[in-house]
């Protein structure tokens, strides 16, 4: 029996594509998969994007898409570390000499860099690419030939918009937690909330209630899920608007993943 690996949509918000596994009885042949994550960062009074392109010769991946959320919660372990990159499992592919990213009248380039065991395409601007969340981005990936060459693809996609979450307080044990936030402008977003807490016998955040909702501005965490978070002496929460654009690319697939997070990371 082999493993089928899913790229969790929420983990795009952490600027790394990580791996979770479940069982499958089907052996899949390798397929080219490409990702460009576009993560909002605070930069003075405005924002920049931490843009990272990653391309893999992979098998058994399911592409994350924001327009099919599971609109529910689950409990799972939490770690502040970035987890397992796909680059530790699958070989990187060559997507060309550079990737062009255009926002408005400004054009920036992402260049290949070796990061640990894989090749990632990144900007040479340390602080990131200036933009306003919600802007449309035009991307040109030239592609390359050869056994590990990724197909050329060009597209224009909208980035995730900024949002706010209405203040809330932990409910009484046995009660649900109602959430309200600025709704998205269309159905190509999903909202992800993570309620992190220290489990029994721990003084660090090591458990979480993970919820993914339709981006309509309101939902709730059922009492049976939020109770452990409410009862823990150490708590934190995180929210992310995730927007995707998915398309075929040659014999494989490409996924543009844009996120706006609260708390919003600060640009270097």
Report residues per predicted region.
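Bacterial N-terminal signal peptides that target proteins for export
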Residues: 1-10
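Solvent-exposed N-terminal domain segments of exported/luminal and surface proteins
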Residues: 24-133
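Exposed aromatic-hydrophobic patches
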Residues: 121-128, 217-227
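C-terminal motif of bacterial Sec signal peptides marking the signal peptidase cleavage site
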Residues: 17-20
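Short, compositionally biased P/S/T/A/G/V-rich stretches that sit at domain boundaries
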Residues: 28-44, 52, 145-172
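Short helix-loop boundary/capping segments
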Residues: 156-222
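Short beta-strand elements
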Residues: 149-163, 250-268
């Amino acid at each position: 029996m082999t493993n089928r690996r899913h790229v969790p949509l929420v983990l795009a918000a952490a600027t790394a594509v990580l791996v979770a596994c479940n069982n499958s009885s089907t052996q899949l042949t390798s397929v080219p998969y490409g990702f460009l994550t576009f993560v909002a960062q605070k930069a003075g009074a405005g924002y920049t994007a931490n843009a990272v392109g990653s391309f893999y010769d992979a098998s058994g991946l399911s592409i994350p898409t924001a327009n099919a959320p599971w609109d529910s919660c689950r409990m799972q372990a939490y770690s502040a570390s970035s987890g397992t990159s796909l680059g530790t499992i699958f070989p990187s592919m060559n997507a060309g000499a550079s990737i062009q990213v255009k926002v408005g009248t400004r054009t920036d380039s992402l260049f290949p860099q070796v990061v640990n065991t894989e090749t990632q395409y990144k900007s040479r601007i340390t602080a990131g690419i200036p933009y306003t969340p919600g802007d449309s981005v035009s991307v040109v990936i030239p592609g390359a030939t050869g056994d590990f060459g990724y197909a050329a693809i060009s597209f224009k996609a909208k980035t995730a918009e900024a949002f706010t979450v209405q203040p809330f307080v932990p409910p009484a044990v046995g009660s649900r937690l109602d959430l309200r936030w600025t709704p998205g402008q269309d159905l190509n977003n999903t909202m992800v909330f993570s309620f992190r807490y220290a489990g029994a016998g721990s003084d660090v955040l090591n458990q979480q209630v993970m919820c993914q909702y339709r981006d309509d501005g309101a939902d709730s965490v059922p009492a049976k899920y939020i109770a452990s978070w409410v009862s823990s002496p150490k708590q934190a929460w995180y929210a992310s608007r995730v927007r995707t654009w998915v398309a075929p690319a040659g014999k494989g697939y490409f996924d543009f993943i844009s996120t706006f997070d609260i708390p919003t990371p600060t640009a270097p």
